[in-house]
């Protein structure tokens, strides 16, 4: 009897890798598995994979030999040099037309390079974003594949089978994103938006707890209620759960109150913020969210500064509150929703700029649909983003779409009230206030940049355009009126 061949091989049996192949096997695919620590292969095949269609492999040679052609090998390993290391080990074992898939959180430029390098060797490469964490990998993640388009037909049946499904019609949260590094780029932007969402929620929590004095029980009920409306999303849902969790050893203490207020980060938010500068897009909310995590890491310095620097104590703001709690709760909800809309608008504007810069053909409406299920930023209004781009594929900014415009208009009063409360009571809300500032800047017909241009011309002779002739010849002025050179050769800002 001929031994069964694997439909796909997976390298890297950490939790994400294990859950992905369990998902694949549950959809009818036979999976060959390999891990550098070979005992991990045996543990998996005899443990979680026992009695299922898995082929355990103790070498890369065995893995490759066990696969149907064209061979599909998926890497679920640490991003960076480790991916390149395994690619180099696989190359002598593969044939032209075989496919290597990187499912880790790789930088999009690495995926772009790998696509080109492997194409020259006859190997098809896919760099794919996989979102949803451990649970998503097992039950259905959002998958964002990019790379060599010739590879897509060979992995599409597997990826769309294992991805999350949404209504109507069980649509898969997986479709081809674009060439080269496009898949990992979209995943990077997804992660940046995730940073923003988490920071916005934490700022809403801070105001509700420290300004209004809500208990954890009240916070749980508030977020659970919010999850039934416009804010219905995965992160709001899990936040409500977090406020309900008590310590096992001390049932009178909530877990959230025992956690050190110093946030970690893996770097994908930083990548997003850096690239926003490269493509010239003000991704202010994501950048502030990254910086907020940086500030949080200075715990000892903050504790010292709290006894030195003047200003209202944000942790004791609730001692002065005497107003209508329900009204402020609604204002915070409005601020959270409006700021969230700004974050997504900035993210999609950035993807448009990147598509132009890197010559990708991105379908923004379809990208929004990829995020409707399985992923960390899934939320109900993603369908509205799809609708906005269906109505106007050339839409410059989601904020100008009628649905977004009307929602932002309805949230104005609460949004501005929350920003005012934060400033007056010393409550740090960098994401809320940066979102509002971006919104006000974007809708301002005439900004203060004319003075910036004048200053640049004064010290650096950088010239400027005239208001009544914006596309005319650059102008330089002798600002002192005393003749001679007024510009510095030292500065170029």
From Swiss-Prot:
The gene is gnd
List the pathway annotation.
Answer: Carbohydrate degradation; pentose phosphate pathway; D-ribulose 5-phosphate from D-glucose 6-phosphate (oxidative stage): step 3/3
Q: Name one GO cellular component term.
A: cytosol
- The species is Dictyostelium discoideum
Keyword Metal-binding among UniProt keywords: no
| Top-level taxon of origin | Eukaryota
Please list the GO terms describing molecular function.
NADP binding; phosphogluconate dehydrogenase (decarboxylating) activity
Supply the name of the protein: 6-phosphogluconate dehydrogenase, decarboxylating
Mind telling me which Gene3D superfamilies this protein's record contains? 6-Phosphogluconate Dehydrogenase, domain 3 (1.20.5.320), N-(1-d-carboxylethyl)-l-norvaline Dehydrogenase, domain 2 (1.10.1040.10), NAD(P)-binding Rossmann-like Domain (3.40.50.720)
Q: EC number(s) per UniProt?
A: 1.1.1.44
Question: What's one Pfam family the UniProt record gives for this protein?
Answer: 6PGD
**Which residues does the Swiss-Prot or TrEMBL record annotate as the active site?**
187 (proton acceptor), 194 (proton donor)
Question: SMART domains, alphabetically?
Answer: 6PGD
Function text:
Catalyzes the oxidative decarboxylation of 6-phosphogluconate to ribulose 5-phosphate and CO(2), with concomitant reduction of NADP to NADPH.
| Reactions catalysed, as given in the entry | 6-phospho-D-gluconate + NADP(+) = D-ribulose 5-phosphate + CO2 + NADPH
- Where would one find the signal peptide in this protein? none
UniProt binding sites for substrate: 105, 131-133, 190-191, 195, 266, 293, 456, 462
Q: Does the keyword Oxidoreductase apply?
A: yes
Q: What biological-process GO terms show up in the record?
A: D-gluconate metabolic process; pentose-phosphate shunt, oxidative branch
Binding partners and assembly:
Homodimer.
Which of UniProt's keywords are assigned here?
Gluconate utilization, NADP, Oxidoreductase, Pentose shunt
Listed binding positions for NADP(+) are 12-17, 35-37, 77-79, 105
Give the InterPro entries listed for this entry: 6-PGluconate_DH-like_C_sf (IPR008927), 6PGD_dom2 (IPR013328), 6PGDH_C (IPR006114), 6PGDH_Gnd/GntZ (IPR006113), 6PGDH_NADP-bd (IPR006115), 6PGdom_BS (IPR006184), NAD(P)-bd_dom_sf (IPR036291), Pgluconate_DH (IPR006183)
Please spell out the taxonomic lineage of the organism that makes this protein: Eukaryota, Amoebozoa, Evosea, Eumycetozoa, Dictyostelia
Task: Return the similarity comment.
Answer: Belongs to the 6-phosphogluconate dehydrogenase family.
């Amino acid at each position: 009897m001929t031994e069964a061949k694997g439909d796909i091989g997976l390298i890297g049996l950490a939790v994400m890798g294990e859950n992905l192949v369990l998902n694949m096997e549950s959809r009818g695919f036979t999976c060959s598995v390999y891990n550098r620590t070979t005992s991990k292969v045996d543990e998996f095949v005899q443990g979680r994979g026992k009695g299922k269609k898995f082929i355990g492999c103790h070498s890369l040679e065995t893995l490759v030999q066990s696969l149907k052609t064209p061979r599909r090998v998926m890497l679920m390993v640490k991003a960076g040099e480790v991916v390149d290391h395994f690619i180099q080990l696989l190359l002598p074992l593969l044939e032209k037309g075989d496919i290597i898939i990187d499912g880790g959180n790789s930088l999009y430029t690495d995926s772009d390079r790998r696509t080109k390098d492997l194409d020259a060797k006859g190997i098809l490469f896919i760099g794919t974003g996989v979102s949803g964490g451990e649970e998503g990998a097992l039950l259905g993640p959002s998958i964002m594949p990019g790379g060599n388009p010739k590879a897509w037909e060979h992995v599409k049946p597997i990826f769309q089978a294992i991805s999350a499904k949404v209504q109507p019609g069980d649509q898969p949260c997986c479709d081809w994103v674009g060439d080269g590094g496009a898949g990992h780029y979209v995943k990077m932007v997804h992660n940046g938006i995730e940073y923003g969402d988490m920071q916005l929620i934490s700022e809403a929590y801070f105001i509700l707890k420290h300004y209004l004095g809500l208990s954890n029980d009240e916070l749980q009920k508030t977020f659970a209620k919010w999850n039934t409306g416009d804010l219905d999303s995965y992160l709001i849902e899990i936040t409500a759960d977090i406020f309900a969790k008590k310590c096992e050893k001390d049932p009178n203490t909530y877990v959230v109150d025992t956690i050190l207020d110093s946030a970690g980060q893996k770097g994908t938010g930083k990548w997003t913020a850096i690239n926003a500068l490269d493509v010239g897009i003000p991704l202010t909310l994501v950048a502030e969210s990254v910086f907020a995590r940086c500030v949080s890491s200075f715990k000892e310095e903050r504790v010292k500064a709290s006894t030195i620097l003047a200003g209202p104590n944000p942790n004791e703001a609730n001692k002065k509150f005497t107003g209508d709690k329900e009204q402020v709760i609604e204002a915070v909800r409005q601020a959270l929703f409006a700021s969230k809309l700004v974050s997504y608008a900035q993210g999609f504007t950035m993807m448009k700029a990147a598509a132009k810069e890197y010559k990708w053909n991105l379908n923004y409406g379809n990208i929004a649909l990829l995020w409707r299920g399985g992923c960390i930023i899934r939320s109900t209004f993603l369908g509205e983003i799809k609708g906005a781009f269906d109505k106007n594929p050339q839409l410059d900014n989601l904020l100008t779409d009628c649905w977004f415009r009307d929602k932002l208009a309805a949230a104005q009063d609460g949004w501005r009230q929350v920003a005012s409360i934060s400033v007056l009571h010393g409550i740090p809300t960098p994401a809320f206030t940066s979102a509002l500032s971006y919104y006000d800047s974007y809708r301002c017909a005439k900004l203060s940049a004319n003075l910036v241009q004048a200053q640049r011309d004064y010290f650096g002779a950088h010239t400027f355009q005239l208001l009544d002739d914006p596309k005319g010849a650059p102008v330089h002025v002798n600002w002192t009126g005393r003749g001679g050179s007024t510009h510095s050769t030292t500065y170029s800002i």
